């Protein structure tokens, strides 16, 4: 999450404070460099000293995601990362996730946006009533397969219906 009344910069450096301090003292030049780098990568324009709550929901989402990148995580676990964001911001988030995965890292994505899953994922696990309804490989992923599995429709049940 974000600390909405705090600045964009404060939110971006919060998870990295331990790495940006030495002997209990904050390294302001390192903090400023990190903020400038992340703001550039996120395409956040304007003053990073303004409150994060002044950003659009999509830009807030980019800050919430990007603040973890300096920690060099091997896994990102995301829940509906593009819900409620505009198309351009969604594209930027997709680019960030693809770049992360291209570095050999794992992105685990829970999403109610079926086209997003088709567009981003190389594997999809569909849950229905708390159980795995389908595990789809890249060549099996389609909106129909995902929705069908979520609704309990399988090849066997389709044959019974015919």
Could you tell me what each predicted segment is?
Residues 1-162:
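Glycine-rich phosphate-binding loops of nucleotide-dependent enzymes
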């Amino acid at each position: 999450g974000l600390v909405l009344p705090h600045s964009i910069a404060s939110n971006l450096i919060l998870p990295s404070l331990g790495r940006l301090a030495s002997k209990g003292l904050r390294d302001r030049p390192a903090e400023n460099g990190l903020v400038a780098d992340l703001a550039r990568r996120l395409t956040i324009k304007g003053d990073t000293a303004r409150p994060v709550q002044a950003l659009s929901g999509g830009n807030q989402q980019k800050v919430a995601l990007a603040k973890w990148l300096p920690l060099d995580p091997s896994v990102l676990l995301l829940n509906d990362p593009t819900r409620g964001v505009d198309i351009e911001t969604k594209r930027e988030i997709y680019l960030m996730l693809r770049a992360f995965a291209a570095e050999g890292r794992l992105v685990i994505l829970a999403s109610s946006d079926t086209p997003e899953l088709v567009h981003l994922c190389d594997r999809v696990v569909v849950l229905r009533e708390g159980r795995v309804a389908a595990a789809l490989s890249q060549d099996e992923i389609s909106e129909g397969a995902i929705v069908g599995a979520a609704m309990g429709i399988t090849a066997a049940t389709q044959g019974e219906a015919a």
